[in-house]
Amino acid sequence: MSLKLPQAPNSGLFKQGYSSFSNADGAIIRNVEAVREIASILLTSMGPSGRNKIIVNKLGKKFITNDAATMLNELEIVHPVVKILIQASKQQEFEMGDNTNLVIILAGEFLNVAEKLLTLGLNVSEIIQGFNLANKFVMKTLDELVVEKVESFETDLLKAVKPVIAAKQYGVEDTIAKLVVDAVALVMKNGSFNVDNIRVVKVMGASLSQSQVVKGMVFPREPEGTVKNADQIQSCRVYQPHRYFHHRNQRYSCSSTMPRKCLISPRAKNNSWTSCARKSTIQGLRWLLPGSSVGELALHYLNKYGILVLRVPSKFDLRRICQVCGATPLPRLGAPTPDEMGEIDIIETKEIGGDRVTIFRQDESSSRTATIVVRGATQNNLDDIERAIDDGVNSIKGLIKDNRLLPGAGAVEIELMKRITAYQSTPGLLQLAIKSFAKAFEVIPRVLAETSGHDSSEILSKLHAAHAEDTGLRAGIDIDSGEVADTAVLDILATKKSAIDLAVDATNTILSIDQIIMAKRAGGPVMPQQPRPGNWDQDD
């Protein structure tokens, strides 16, 4: 009798190198464990007192941040189920710009309670059905928990932006929120604006209190060439091509039998630059913004005719400056027409903190671009402030869609937990899934209490007692004193709805996966970064 060795599942079906994990092998439990791992990484980074993480990417660049979106972008995650959750958080970042951490944490907690229900014997379809019913009830309940509205964007916008920024930069949220609101007020037109019209320029030195908002654009570089006197040029015309006056240094050679022909090429080239610069000056050109480097010969004639050159390598910045001054980007070589040139009110070159910056200031109402000049002591601090500003600007985009506000600081989660638990309209085993769904919301106030250094069990008991009363809707966690009171912290309804909905969708998608089939990774073997010990080619 011959001996038969056991083969891998589906070994005769797929090509060599495939791996398969089915539900019989515990695929769902493994998926939950993978999601729990990524959720535990981001869990302690939530809230105003959230901890920072040090992440070193594959290029060796270090990130010190508590921003979930930044961490997920820099982490190289290969697990296919966790990637589903990351896609949901990126969708939240794209649509609302905030609460990306909430999507991961809620989905991880939903899967934790679902794992317990699976061990009790509930079917996956029953858990998904119960979660969907509870999610529909939550969407209706959130509309009933609205406490305030942003009626006027000039006066009420600050109270909605402060909590968003405080989650990233606690203690300086007043200063940053004022910068964000001022910048949005400059670019908003008829109740709407484009988030790309608000730029952030980081300048090392000084403190955050010296940051300012400029109507127009600020470039962290000084002009090229010798023409640098750019202080307050009124009503100047700006010509903005992508490539203009760019000429590589070329070497010319000739034999002794052709001396006259040898002089034609450089002389013709000089005449071309002279003609272009002279005609541009006649048309009124005072400023030139090329999208690439400028050759030495072209820069010589531009300096000769008093044309100031500022190189803008970013094509996105070129498009924005076109919107500010009304210029047309041109790829051709030659003098621009009056219709192709733009106008600007004030152009000035200033020194901020030892760095030379060029400011395009447009005081007219037609300009829809604003720049926040951020000051700080370290580069890491400036990066964190920039992320907080981005979250604040994107949160205003969510307020434009829906101006209703919810109580924050863990108040709305405890209230949802109370109302979902009292939801008794569904009989049978689905009631277990609905109550477990409600229990998952308790993770938010627990994390807020733990990261702020307080006893989470004591605070949770006080929260439940406060929300048991009819007047306790706005009772939240005061992270400074550790008490439960009306903290005046507000959350945006549209952002909260989107985060919960995406977390539930991602949870149901992960629970419905009963098998994972993975192909062999393409490419050859990865070469070692360092020589192995004992290698004959290694220097002793």
Swiss-Prot record:
Annotated Gene Ontology cellular component terms: chaperonin-containing T-complex
Q: Name one GO biological process term.
A: chaperone mediated protein folding independent of cofactor
Enumerate the Gene3D superfamilies for this protein.
Answer: GroEL, GroEL-like equatorial domain, TCP-1-like chaperonin intermediate domain
GO MF term set: ATP binding; ATP hydrolysis activity; ATP-dependent protein folding chaperone; unfolded protein binding
Task: Provide an example Pfam family for this protein.
Answer: Cpn60_TCP1
Q: Which InterPro entries match?
A: Chap_CCT_theta, Chaperone_TCP-1, Chaperonin_TCP-1_CS, Cpn60/GroEL/TCP-1, GroEL-like_apical_dom_sf, GROEL-like_equatorial_sf, TCP-1-like_intermed_sf
Q: Which domain of life is it from?
A: Eukaryota
Per the record's keyword annotation, is Magnesium included, yes or no? no
Keyword Chaperone, does the record have it?
A: yes
- Where in the cell? Cytoplasm
Q: Please provide the record's keywords in A-Z order.
A: ATP-binding, Chaperone, Cytoplasm, Nucleotide-binding
Name the protein family: Belongs to the TCP-1 chaperonin family.
Q: What does this protein do?
A: Molecular chaperone; assists the folding of proteins upon ATP hydrolysis. Known to play a role, in vitro, in the folding of actin and tubulin. In yeast may play a role in mitotic spindle formation.
Q: How does it assemble?
A: Heterooligomeric complex of about 850 to 900 kDa that forms two stacked rings, 12 to 16 nm in diameter.
Name of this protein: T-complex protein 1 subunit theta
Q: Which organism is it from?
A: Candida albicans (Yeast)
UniProt gene name:
CCT8
